[in-house]
Amino acid sequence: KTTITNYIRKHKNIPILDADNLSRELIKPNTYGYKKILDYFGNKIIDNKNNSEGIINRKLLRNIIFKNSESKEWIEKLLHPLIKEKMIEECSKYKNNQTIVLVIPLLFEAKFEDICTEIWLVKCPRELQKKRLITRDKISEKEAYDSINLQLSFEEKRKFSDIILDNSDDQNKWIDTIRELL
């Protein structure tokens, strides 16, 4: 997703909204999401290293929700509606644009399909996906697998997708497709 998003950002004049970036905004200190998370998890969720602002330790939060399905469900019930609302609000700023790219890693799991007019699914082998996650997020192999396993399978996602972009190895495959579509 990141490679394709970066390509669109560089070569097309199309707004891009990323659900992960919005979620980071929604849990910054003194926001509603931040306060709710602290109420639920307590101060143990605060990153104590070089952190005078009281920023939430996202890696610790991720580890907690991977190990505890109740916590995972709670955080999803809190954040998914907030992210969706924020994404709709941000989209309204671009109402004069014909196209807006929404990057939503858990599109189907969070039930965000209704805010999309067309769904593009980025395909890559699980092993490559795992490798990219480890490199990008600086997480362990187990954490990468846990993250991947939280998602619907590619086969399930494919059923609900309009376009499949293969980001396995040859960039020319998906670049040509994007040029045609945009």
Indicate residue ranges for each PLM-predicted region.
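The feature captures the helix immediately C-terminal to the Walker
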Residues: 5-6
